[in-house]
Amino acid sequence: MKNIYSPSFRSMSRGLALTLGLLLALLLSLPSYAQDGQSKVPINRTISGFTLGVTTPAEARAIIQRQGGKIIAEEGAQNGGDDGGYAFTGFKYARRPTSLITLHFYKGHPRKIAFVFDKLDVLEQIESELENKYGMMAEGKETSKMKSKVIFDAFTFLEVVRRFEYEGHVGFDHAYIAYTDAELDRARLAEKESEI
């Protein structure tokens, strides 16, 4: 049996205590993005030429035309309407074709941009690239016909959403990747709640 009062045992105990103390300090100093859902780097706010919270509807229209896109629906965006927006085609996201892009405005600036895909394998490739860049996404809202994953920073939410034809997540229908300006989204929600 070891004598716990011997000098060699005390130095070993001090070494163990020091090691455990350093390990605890290291764990406590882990960056906050070590948690799922919080981005390890700032999320890009300029996507396909549109900058969340900055680009005006007129600038957005010019970007769409300059890049060869075609506006297929427009609602209130030309007047800077609170919930105006464009739906357009002809753009790629991460070098992959999209079936539709929607750009939603609030107070005359982009609040959200969503890229719609009709192929699940394309979405999964992009999702993997996003997680490599920003970190592990957290499980988001889920219903019987929809699943989502999210990652965020102080200014931007990035969401990957899968929609299904049938309940129980059966029969892939389409998916989208959406970037949302956190401040504009909060302001819009507060305004909507005050109307109730």
Describe the function of each predicted region.
Residues 1-2, 91, 132:
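Generic cytosolic/nucleocytoplasmic N-terminal low-complexity/intrinsically disordered segments
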Residues 2-20:
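Bacterial N-terminal signal peptides that target proteins for export
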Residues 17-29:
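Bacterial N-terminal signal peptides
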Residues 30-34:
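Sec/Tat signal peptide C-region and signal peptidase I cleavage site
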Residues 35-78, 112-196:
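Non-cytosolic coordination micro-motifs
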Residues 77-124:
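Mid-chain, structured segments of secreted extracytoplasmic proteins
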